[in-house]
């Protein structure tokens, strides 16, 4: 199992993104040359450089993470291709896959109607992420799940409409018209003060992936580590994460999807989930 205490270390890669991308550029030239010699088609696979443990760059400047590891297993099943792994930013990945700069992208992404208009989503997911709510520890005895939160009339930190989490809450409200959660739209995708707002009582909960809570509250040297006794987290559900494929690469998308399906049946994805997360994330999906 990958150590969560390494999250802070991986976050430092954000500041070194320029160095990482420069190194990736050199590697890209070498990969293209190698593929040309072997007759294989190069597939550019972009991934976020610092989203530990999904997609990141390790201490040796090598692409790593659950989704990268799964894609490397996919590559083994597709000998006609040579995958070139390119660490990059979220924005460059999304724009790059849409424009064709990259063929595939991985960033722990969920499927939404808006995204399906821009990218091909393989039928088989590549992983999963757990989403839930950070609340004050003093509320933990009465609020144990999202239904409790909603029925108590608690307020969530605002969520940007373009954030997939906004759709998750919208779907919850549609399924629970008798006690919907008040959903306030934010102009900003990331809310830097979210944990502070919960601590202060300005809002009662922060709806985010479990990884965010671990990185910001429970990990070693976490920004809000001094408040870990005042905050707690409950899970709502797990959502499948997918590889994004450029809209024109229909054949590639079908081949990747088939490979992912085979890896699931073989138990390889479950094995990698245990390695990077310590549990089988797909089992959480089955419980929903």
PLM regions with names:
Residues 68-78, 137-140, 147-150, 154-160, ...:
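Extended ligand-binding regions for polar small-molecule ligands
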Residues 35-109:
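Extracytoplasmic small-molecule ligand-binding "clamshell" domains
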Residues 32, 81-84, 161-184, 258-288:
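Ligand-binding clefts/hinges and TM-proximal coupling segments of bilobed small-molecule sensing domains
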Residues 84-149:
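Acidic, polar ligand-binding/catalytic clefts
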Residues 49, 127-132, 220-257, 279-288:
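Periplasmic-binding protein-like
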Residues 84-95, 183-196, 200:
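Short helix-initiation/N-cap motifs at beta->coil->alpha
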Residues 108-118, 167-171, 199-237:
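A ligand-binding cleft/hinge motif common to bilobed small-molecule-binding domains
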Residues 49-52, 63-75, 132-190, 210-212:
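Bilobed "Venus flytrap"/periplasmic-binding protein-like clamshell domains
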């Amino acid at each position: 199992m990958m150590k969560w205490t390494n999250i802070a270390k991986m976050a430092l890669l954000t500041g070194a993104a320029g160095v990482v991308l420069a190194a990736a550029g050199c590697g890209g030239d070498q990969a293209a040359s190698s593929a040309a010699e072997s007759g294989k088609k190069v597939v550019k696979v972009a991934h976020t450089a610092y989203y530990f443990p999904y997609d990141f760059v390790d201490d040796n400047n090598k692409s790593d993470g659950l989704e990268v590891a799964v894609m490397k297993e996919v590559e083994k099943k597709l000998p006609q291709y040579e995958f070139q792994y390119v660490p990059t930013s979220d924005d460059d990945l999304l724009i790059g896959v849409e424009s064709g700069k990259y063929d595939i992208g991985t960033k722990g992404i969920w499927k939404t109607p808006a995204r399906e208009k821009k990218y091909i989503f393989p039928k088989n997911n590549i992983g999963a992420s757990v989403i839930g709510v950070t609340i004050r520890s003093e509320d933990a005895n009465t609020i144990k799940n999202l239904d409790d939160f909603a029925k108590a009339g608690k307020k969530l930190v605002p969520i940007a409409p373009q954030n997939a989490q906004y759709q998750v809450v919208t779907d919850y409200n549609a399924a629970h018209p008798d006690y919907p959660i008040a959903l306030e739209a934010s102009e900003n995708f990331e809310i830097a003060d979210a944990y502070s707002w919960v601590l202060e009582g300005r809002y009662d909960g922060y709806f985010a992936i479990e990884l965010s809570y671990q990185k910001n509250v429970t990990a070693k040297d976490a920004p809000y580590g001094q408040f870990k006794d005042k905050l707690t987290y409950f899970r709502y559900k797990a959502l499948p994460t997918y590889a994004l494929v450029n809209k024109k690469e229909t054949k590639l998308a079908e081949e990747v999807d088939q490979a992912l399906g085979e890896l699931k049946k073989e138990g390889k994805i479950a094995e990698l989930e245990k390695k990077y997360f310590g549990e089988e994330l797909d089992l959480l999906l089955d419980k929903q």
